[in-house]
Swiss-Prot record:
PANTHER family: ACETYLORNITHINE DEACETYLASE, N-ACETYL-L-CITRULLINE DEACETYLASE
Substrates-to-products reaction catalysed: N-succinyl-(2S,6S)-2,6-diaminopimelate + H2O = (2S,6S)-2,6-diaminopimelate + succinate
Cofactor(s) annotated in UniProt: Zn(2+); Co(2+)
Gene Ontology BP term (one): diaminopimelate biosynthetic process
Family the entry assigns: Belongs to the peptidase M20A family.
Alphabetical keyword list: Amino-acid biosynthesis, Cobalt, Diaminopimelate biosynthesis, Hydrolase, Lysine biosynthesis, Metal-binding, Zinc
Residues spanning the membrane: none
EC number of the protein: 3.5.1.18
Any GO molecular function: succinyl-diaminopimelate desuccinylase activity
Name listed for the protein in its UniProt record: Succinyl-diaminopimelate desuccinylase
Organism: Corynebacterium glutamicum (strain ATCC 13032 / DSM 20300 / JCM 1318 / BCRC 11384 / CCUG 27702 / LMG 3730 / NBRC 12168 / NCIMB 10025 / NRRL B-2784 / 534)
Length: 369
């Protein structure tokens, strides 16, 4: 028997300590049961009057029902990418290292702590919903937030959603959309010494490659924020042997687009710009795609957070995050958490502990009278 079993999660204590406890519970995607159990137990053991706690698969949800004028959702995923010899966690010189420290157990810890400390406070300004969900780091059809949307949509009702992805304590508003298109060229195989008997599939892609290389990406201003689009070839493959004209070539295009376009508009833009339709021997197909999320900074419920963070610390989110799911449901959504996202998924994943404290203080200021 292990005589050094750690106590359950202390949601009311220091969010830095809570972050480290969460990090030290391994939870790669698909293996979230233990961390979901501990989060659920911690919430139920608080016995907060008037607070509803609900378990759905490995998603843990909680909400207040105080009849306040507006509702803010605090959402964070509980899974991580596969562990890369970076557990257990450690803290050195004010930096916490370990799998999930930045993506996104620091943000999750802050949201759990904030919910636990304010749910029954007389100073609370907005009703709160807490969503701790599974399988964000893997295929879309496994995403816990999507399952909640499909099976229990009433739990996602809110005037504003905050997602605890790492932002360095800044507000990263909305997110860009993400589109991947596979373009395939068909030719005729032949010996390279008699190339005129064949039809080089790779050469058929070359005009499209040239158009992508010459593409001038747009910079789009929305609510005073600049979103930067990008169209790139991210994978290309062809070839049979060094003396064979290839009869097949394909490439993947990735288009990151500003949230003023929806997914269908993004597809249409790429197809028209690259003239993919009507080319002999060329076919294309959408491999994956998701629309972005508008920033929603003009909402009244958002103004207090902007004041607490500071207007000089607001920027556009260039990557795609689950705020897109909230936007699709008509809920304004912002990314707000601790840490530098460039350390996500790395062996040296890390988060400054000071930022955990700062983000918790900002959230308390925003949500309290």
């Amino acid at each position: 028997m292990n005589s050094e079993l750690k106590p359950g999660l202390d949601l009311l204590g220091d969010p830095i300590v809570l972050t480290q406890r969460l990090v030290d519970i391994p939870s790669p995607s698909g293996q979230e049961k233990q961390i979901a159990d501990e989060i659920e137990d911690a919430l139920r053991n608080l016995n907060l009057p008037g607070v509803e706690v609900f378990r759905f698969n490995n998603n843990v949800l909680a909400r207040t029902n105080r009849g306040l004028a507006s509702r803010v959702m605090l959402a964070g995923h509980i899974d991580t990418v596969p562990i890369a010899d970076n557990l257990p966690s450690r803290v050195e010189d004010g930096i916490m290292y370990g799998c999930g420290t930045v993506d996104m157990k620091s943000g999750l810890a802050v949201y759990l702590h904030t919910f636990a400390t304010l749910a029954t406070s007389t100073e609370l300004k907005h009703d709160l919903t807490l969503i701790a969900y599974e399988c964000e780091e893997v295929a879309d059809h496994l995403n816990g937030l999507g399952h909640i949307r499909d099976e229990h949509p009433e739990w996602l009702a809110a005037d504003l959603a905050l997602l605890g992805e790492p932002t360095g304590g800044w507000i990263e508003a909305g997110c860009q959309g993400n589109l991947r298109i596979k373009v395939t060229a068909h030719g005729v195989r032949a010996h390279s010494a008699r190339s005129w008997l064949g039809d080089n599939a790779m050469h058929k892609l070359s005009p499209i490659i040239s158009k992508v290389a010459a593409y001038k990406a747009a910079e789009v201003n929305i609510d005073g924020l600049t979103y930067r689009e990008g169209l790139n070839i991210v994978f290309c493959e062809s070839g049979v042997a060094n003396n064979v004209i290839p009869d097949l070539a394909w490439m993947n295009l990735n288009f990151r687009f500003a949230p003023n376009r929806d997914l269908n508009e993004a597809i249409e833009h790429v197809v028209e710009t690259l003239e993919l339709d009507g080319q002999d021997g060329i076919e294309w197909a959408v491999e994956d795609g998701a629309g972005g999320a508008l920033p929603g900074l003009g909402q009244q419920v958002t103004s207090g957070l902007i004041d607490a963070v500071g207007r000089e610390k607001i920027r556009a989110k260039f990557g795609w995050t689950d705020v897109s799911r909230f936007s699709a449901m008509g809920i304004p959504a912002l990314n707000f958490g601790a840490g530098d996202p460039s350390f996500a998924h790395k062996r040296d994943e890390q988060c400054p502990v000071e930022q955990i404290t700062d983000v918790a203080a900002i959230l308390k200021q925003y949500l309290s009278e």
